[in-house]
Amino acid sequence: VGDTAGAIEHYEIAGTHCAEVPRMLFERDRVEDLEEYITQGNNTELLKWWSQYMESRGEFEKARQHYTRAQDFLSVVRLACQSGDVEGAVDIVNDSGSAPAAYHLARHLEALGRTAEAVAFYTRSSRFNHAIRLAKDHGMDSELMGFALQSRPALMVSVAEHLERKGEMEKAVQLYQKAGDVARALDVCFRAAMGDERGEGRRPGMFDTLKAMTDDLGTNASPQV
């Protein structure tokens, strides 16, 4: 049979226990001893491994408990979503603050058609590209500006173009400027101030914005601007 306790001690000293102890105890058909070894310890890697093993055997409650001990909140939320416990998944994300768990929940909520909630959790996970995509597709224009201001420049420009098409020129100008596309911001500002060919739809207030922008640029502006 061999000295199991001694072998475990040596594996731990060598730092190979996460792989070797499960292998040894499985080979010796001592699964209960393996469960005791893992669950009485606090090794995150082993707890995750045991959780996956429990999940593969359909013992989802045990899997959930050990995923929680390992602070693998993504897996806890995944199990909750699989079982249809969406509200439980929401509570887990709220309590843990886990961004990966929030992203998984957002994808699940989107699949369920719960768009507003999906957008909120995409935002919580800092996946602003998905939040912006859904907000555009579902007419959530009032929230777009906030998402864009927290995102990278390419997304700011994308939202600015969307808002420009919707006639939200002031917001478009602000986003173009923040994204570093000053030339485009000036162009939109000027066109909005002048209106169409007949001068209709003019927004004289945009001249003030235009002046402020050109003053900020000063004499060091690129000739292209």
PLM features: residue spans?
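Extended alpha-helical assembly domains of large eukaryotic scaffold proteins
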Residues: V1-V225
